[in-house]
UniProtKB/Swiss-Prot annotation, chain A:
Annotated organism of origin: Danio rerio (Zebrafish)
Name of this protein: Survival motor neuron protein 1
Entry annotated with the keyword Zinc-finger: no
TM annotation in the entry: none
Chain positions found as Phosphoserine: 17, 20
Gene3D superfamilies tied to this protein: 2.30.30.140, Periplasmic binding protein-like II (3.40.190.10)
């Protein structure tokens, strides 16, 4: 129709408008005649149906789904650490991950001293063991890291001290091993060494401290530099659990006791009222 | 029906169904249970549908008896296939789109001097315009036809040219459609009628007015009646009649009038 219209416009310019009008004017009539004739064709032959069937089947769409798996890479271990950087480090005592800040770096040895932000104590760590972000590791991997961390910390303690001081360290570690000797050692060198008798007194106080006053939390040393003791051991936790269970059972028992007491009072009043009535009658 | 009704509606008053017919209908019920069983029996005897027999003699006012029926079923072999109907509907839709597309162009065209369109209210004028004087006056002058070899639209009727049809307004289309259908009700189907009906349906705009719906339904019923009276498949009118029924039923959504294969 569009082509026909264009032709008509072109022909009109030449002056054959009558013929073009008549030719295109009959579009409706031709459509009608075509429609009427198609029914006769449909009645005559069944061959017309076959090509339609061929045209019917359409092309099947192929769904090509691309699965892109993104691999997450952990922080590069070759990162250069500087004093004042924030990081995550495994504490040698329990192998847990804590936030820390670097206070000094030794590039030659590949070690540094980290200050645990949440707990306030310091420890010497290998630069390769520090982490920029806490990784999402499996339990097995975590255990493996713990084991490695323990070994590395032992080596560090052996290397970092002079023979005389190392001797003292060995002696102290033997006596105060459960109290966390690695956390105490880094703080000793910066301060001046005290005289022997005073040192012995401090040692005695430490021995006395944990027993009577705080079963799971040793007291802070006023004379020496401030330090936070390690987290409590397992036995106090177990005791606390028992205490919780005991208090729960006691509360159950007491609620039963109070209920029984109330019921008894009520019954007693009823009996008294009944006896009075019977006595009057 | 009763079983369905019992299942659908909740039972407000459970009464055991009376299997035995020990109770006689003549005696009055002696207890409430008997009464309820009487009610059940009478209800089961009533038919679901009751039609009243009206005596025409007793009617005071004269009422119009309108018997509206659907399209007559096509004789065997006369009805078109569903695929053919779908093709016709799609082509008809394309024709309508083309007409709307080129309406402005054809409106601007001037008609020849011999083309004088009647007024909308002039029913006889439109009949003469569409069918020609020969068909209207039922004059058969073979001699004159031989004498005049050229086209004389005044006598043979004007075909539905686009330049003519494009100038019709919707009210005129509806009016002319009514005139042609009324003419068709009393007379036979002629080729000019088929062309004009096709053209008018192509120009009829959707959505239709209720009057237009009534007109096209009337047309479809008339076409089916004429088709039922045809003698053979080879009749030239069969295609046109099927086409009209198909357009009305399939395109204008009068599906109750459609042909069933």
């Amino acid at each position: 129709m569009a082509n026909g219209a264009e032709d008509v416009v072109f022909c009109r310019g030449t002056g054959q408008s009558d013929d073009s009008d008549i030719w295109d004017d009959t579009a409706l009539i031709k459509a009608y005649d075509k429609a009427v004739a198609s029914f006769k064709n449909a009645l005559k032959g069944e061959d017309g149906a076959t090509p339609q069937e061929n045209d019917n089947p359409g092309k099947k769409r192929k769904n090509n789904k691309k699965n892109k798996s993104r691999k997450r890479c952990n922080a590069a271990p070759d990162k250069e650490w500087q004093v004042g950087d924030s990081c995550y480090a495994f504490w040698s005592e329990d192998g847990n991950l804590y936030t820390a800040t670097i206070t000094s770096v030794d590039q030659e040895k590949g070690t540094c001293v980290v200050f645990y932000t949440d707990y306030g104590n310091e420890e010497e760590q290998n630069l390769s063991d520090l982490l920029t972000e806490p990784p999402d590791m499996d339990e097995d991997a975590l255990k493996t890291a713990n084991v490695k961390e323990t070994e590395s910390s032992t080596e560090e303690s052996d290397r970092s001290f002079t023979p005389q001081k190392s001797g003292h360290a060995k002696h102290k570690s033997k006596s105060n091993f459960p109290m966390g000797p690695p956390s105490w050692f880094p703080s000793f060198p910066p301060g001046p060494p005290p005289p022997p008798p005073h040192f012995k007194k401090m040692d005695g106080r430490r021995g006395e401290g944990p027993g009577p006053s705080f079963p799971g939390w040793p007291p802070m040393i006023p004379l020496g530099p401030p330090m936070i003791p390690p987290p409590p051991p397992m036995s106090p936790d177990f005791g606390e659990d028992d205490e919780a269970l005991g208090s729960m059972l006691i509360s159950w028992y007491m609620s039963g006791y109070h209920t029984g007491y109330y019921m008894g009072l009520r019954q007693g009043r009823k009996e008294a009222a009944a006896s009075k009535k019977s006595h009057r009658k | 029906m009763k079983s369905d009704a019992e299942e659908l509606m909740p039972r407000l008053l459970p009464v055991d169904s009376c299997d035995t017919e020990e109770y006689t209908l003549t005696e009055p019920p002696r207890n409430p249970q008997e009464y309820l069983r009487f009610v059940q029996r009478e209800a089961s005897l009533c038919p679901d549908v009751v039609v009243a027999q009206i005596d025409p003699k007793k009617l005071k006012k004269q009422s119009v008896n309108v018997s509206i029926t659907g399209c007559l079923a096509a004789p065997e072999g006369f009805s078109p296939s569903f695929k053919w109907q779908q093709q016709q509907v799609s082509r008809f839709s394309e024709v309508r789109q083309s007409v709307n597309k080129h309406r402005q162009h054809w409106k601007a065209q001037f008609l020849d001097d011999n083309v004088v369109m009647p007024k909308t209210e002039d029913e006889d004028g439109w009949k003469r315009f569409c069918f020609g004087e020969n068909v209207c006056l039922e004059i058969q002058l073979k001699e004159e036809d031989g004498v005049n070899p050229g086209l004389d639209y005044v006598k043979t009727g004007f075909p539905p040219f686009l330049s003519i049809v494009s100038k019709l307004s919707q009210s005129t289309v509806s009016a002319v459609l009514e005139y042609l259908i009324n003419w068709f009700e009393e007379r036979d189907f002629v080729p000019q009628l088929g062309r004009w009906l096709y053209a008018l349906l192509a120009c009829l705009e959707k959505p239709l007015l209720p009057e237009a719906h009534s007109l096209i339904r009337q047309l479809a019923r008339r076409c089916s009646a004429v088709r039922a009276n045809l003698e053979s498949k080879d009749d030239d009118r069969l295609s046109a009649l099927n086409l009209m029924i198909c357009i009305v039923a399939r395109y204008f959504e009068q599906n109750d009038l459609a042909d069933k294969e």
